[in-house]
């Protein structure tokens, strides 16, 4: 089984969006049994809160439910459990490293490092650049 943890600052916008989109993709590929997919925050600010209404709205428009998801903070033990820890921006990567201390197995990646155009995914909470419906 491949275990993937998506990580952002608060675990209410970007990382749950990535978690549920990837879950949907894996399910549509018939590979659900091969993956465990979750998300977490590097901060404590939103712990226990549900996915942000703007993120929920976008996922619902795509026919994807994130019901029952509440923000949780990443723990040092997550490094041992997950095969991939994927942050949304360089700040997330720095905070992941602060939590886990070191990455001897090369498990930490930035999300868009897997794309042809590696870059940060801006935090919509502060920038409104990723999906403007969150800021409305």
Model-derived features: positions:
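Conserved active-site segments centered on acidic
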Residues: 1-81
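Glycine/proline-rich loop-helix segments at beta-alpha junctions forming the active-site rim
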Residues: 60, 72-129
